[in-house]
From Swiss-Prot:
Organism ancestry: Bacteria, Bacillati, Actinomycetota, Actinomycetes, Micrococcales
HAMAP family in alphabetical order: GARS (MF_00138)
Cofactor note: Binds 1 Mg(2+) or Mn(2+) ion per subunit.
PANTHER family listed in its UniProt record: PHOSPHORIBOSYLAMINE--GLYCINE LIGASE, PHOSPHORIBOSYLAMINE--GLYCINE LIGASE, CHLOROPLASTIC
Reaction catalyzed: 5-phospho-beta-D-ribosylamine + glycine + ATP = N(1)-(5-phospho-beta-D-ribosyl)glycinamide + ADP + phosphate + H(+)
Gene responsible for this protein: purD
The protein, known as: Phosphoribosylamine--glycine ligase
Species, as recorded: Leifsonia xyli subsp. xyli (strain CTCB07)
Family in the record: Belongs to the GARS family.
Length: 417
C-alpha cells in the first residue's frame, strides 16, 4: 500500500516503524519527517502539512492509497476534510470532530450530552471568572487552556496565585477551563474508530511532569510504559461502554463522525473511571510503547477505520512482554529548549538488545551531516523486555550511551510498574 504519513515526531516515527515491520512491503512517504524518519523512508520536507489543499494535491499526484495524520495541528486545521471529499482514505478526524481535542469546552459539551463520566468544569473568559471558579473548587487547583497547547496547557497546583497566573497566560489566547481535581491513577487508552465502531489498543501510562517523582512543570510527556498489569480485566470494556461508544455515537448524531484515533485520557478514582481529556490522534510518548507489541498489522486497522469497515474485525492482538520508553529532552525544556546541539552515540544506544530509537526533534546539518537536536523533546528510547525490570534496564543502558550537551531525562519511568 502507498501510504503518506503527516508529522515529524517520535509518534510518527513509531507509526512508520510499525508499518515497515509488516510483510506487506508498503511504500511510505513522510511529510515533513525528521532525520530518523528520513533514514527509513522517503520524506517530503517542503509540503505544508497544515494546508489541506496542498496535501490533497500531493496525495492525488502521487497516488497515495492511505493518508495518516499524526499531529493534532493538521487535524484541527481540517486537513482531513478535502482528502475525504476527493475520496482518499484518511486516518484522522475532520475539522469538526477534531474539536474534541481542539476545544476543551467542546469536549465537555460532548461528554455532557453523551453522559460520559468526567469532572465538573467551569469555562472562564476573564481573570475574574477564573478566580471565582478557583475559589468554588478549592485546592488542588486545575486550570486548562481551552485550545491546543502542545501538552503544556494544564496546571495542577496547591498555589492559587500560580493557578491564576496560568489562567492569565492562556486567557490572552482564548478561554480557560477551571476543573475539579480528580485523584487517582491516570491511564491512556487508544481506540481506533471508523465513526461507528471502536477497537481498543493496549492501555498505557505516561509521565507528564518534567522531573522524577512527578515534580516540575507539565510537558508533552517524558516517558511511558505498557501494558498496565494493575488494571482490572474489565477496564477496557468499561471504557468502551461508558466513554468511547457514547462519545462516538454523540459525534455521529451531530453529523461529525469521528474517524481516526480516539485517545481517552482517563483517571481511575475511588468513584470510578473519569475522563480527564480527549485527544484526536495517537499520543506521544504512549504510541512508542503501544505499537511495538501490536501483532495485528497496523495498516489493516488504519485502512479499515479510514474506509468504514471496522465492524466485524477482531480486537487487535498484542504480544506478551512489556515496553518502556524514556524521552530525551534538550536543556531548558519545556520553557526555552536549547537547539542546534549535536547528538552522538545513537548507534551504540540502538545496539542494546530490544532497543529502538524514535526520533522527534532531529535534523542533519546540511554541511557536515552531523545529527542535531532541533527542539524540546529530541527522541524516545524504546525498550522491550519480558518484564518491566528488563525493559527499564535496557532503556537506561541505551540512554547512558547517548551524548547531547545539557540533555535531561527522567530516571523513574516505569519504576513502579
Amino acid at each position: 500500500m502507498k501510504i503518506l504519513v503527516l508529522g515529524s515526531g517520535a509518534r510518527e516515527h513509531a507509526i512508520i516503524t510499525a508499518l515497515l515491520a509488516e510483510r506487506a512491503g508498503h511504500d511510505i512517504v513522510a511529510a515533513p519527517g525528521n532525520a530518523g524518519i528520513a533514514a527509513d523512508v522517503a520524506v517530503e520536507p517542503g509540503l505544508d502539512t497544515l494546508n489541506g489543499a496542498a496535501v490533497t494535491a500531493f496525495a492525488i499526484e502521487n497516488g497515495f492509497e492511505l493518508v495518516v495524520i499524526g499531529p493534532e495541528a493538521p487535524l484541527v486545521a481540517g486537513v482531513a476534510d478535502p482528502l475525504r471529499r476527493r475520496g482518499i482514505p484518511v486516518f484522522g478526524p475532520g475539522r469538526a470532530a477534531a474539536q474534541l481535542e481542539g476545544s476543551k469546552t467542546f469536549a465537555k459539551r460532548i461528554m455532557d450530552e453523551a453522559g460520559v463520566p468526567t469532572g465538573r468544569a467551569v469555562r472562564a473568559a476573564t481573570l475574574a471568572e477564573a478566580g471565582s471558579a478557583l475559589d468554588e473548587f478549592g485546592a488542588p487547583y486545575v486550570v486548562k487552556a481551552d485550545g491546543l497547547a502542545a501538552g503544556k496547557g494544564v496546571i495542577v497546583t496547591e498555589d492559587r496565585a500560580a493557578a491564576l497566573a496560568h489562567a492569565a497566560r492562556y486567557l490572552t489566547h482564548g478561554s480557560v477551563l477551571v476543573e475539579e481535581f480528580l485523584d487517582g491513577e491516570e491511564v491512556s487508552l487508544f481506540l481506533v474508530s471508523d465513526g461507528h465502531t471502536v477497537l481498543p489498543l493496549s492501555p498505557a501510562q505516561d509521565y507528564k511532569r518534567l522531573l522524577d517523582g512527578d515534580a516540575g512543570p507539565n510537558t508533552g510527556g517524558m516517558g511511558a510504559y505498557s501494558p498496565l498489569t494493575w488494571l482490572p480485566e474489565t477496564f477496557v470494556d468499561e471504557v468502551i461502554d461508558t466513554v468511547a461508544m457514547p462519545t462516538v455515537r454523540q459525534l455521529a448524531a451531530e453529523q461529525t463522525p469521528f474517524i481516526g484515533l480516539l485517545y481517552c485520557g482517563l483517571i481511575v478514582t475511588a468513584k470510578g473511571i473519569r475522563v480527564i481529556e480527549f485527544n484526536a490522534r495517537f499520543g506521544d510518548p504512549e504510541t512508542q510503547v503501544v505499537l511495538p507489541r501490536l501483532v495485528t498489522p497496523l495498516s489493516t486497522l488504519l485502512f479499515a477505520a479510514a474506509t468504514g469497515t471496522l465492524s466485524g474485525m477482531p480486537r487487535p492482538e498484542f504480544a506478551p512482554g512489556t515496553t518502556v520508553t524514556v524521552v530525551l529532552a534538550s536543556e531548558d525544556y519545556p520553557e526555552s529548549p536549547r537547539t542546534g546541539r549535536p547528538i552522538a552515540g545513537l548507534d551504540e544506544a540502538a545496539s542494546v538488545p530490544e532497543v529502538t530509537i524514535a526520533h522527534a526533534s532531529t535534523a542533519r546539518d546540511e554541511t557536515t551531516g552531523a545529527l542535531l537536536a532541533t527542539g524540546g523533546r529530541v527522541l524516545s528510547v524504546v525498550a522491550r523486555g519480558a518484564t518491566f525490570a528488563d525493559a527499564r534496564t535496557r532503556a537506561y543502558d541505551a540512554l547512558s550511551r547517548i551524548r547531547l550537551d545539557g540533555s535531561q531525562y527522567r530516571t523513574d519511568i516505569a519504576a513502579r510498574a
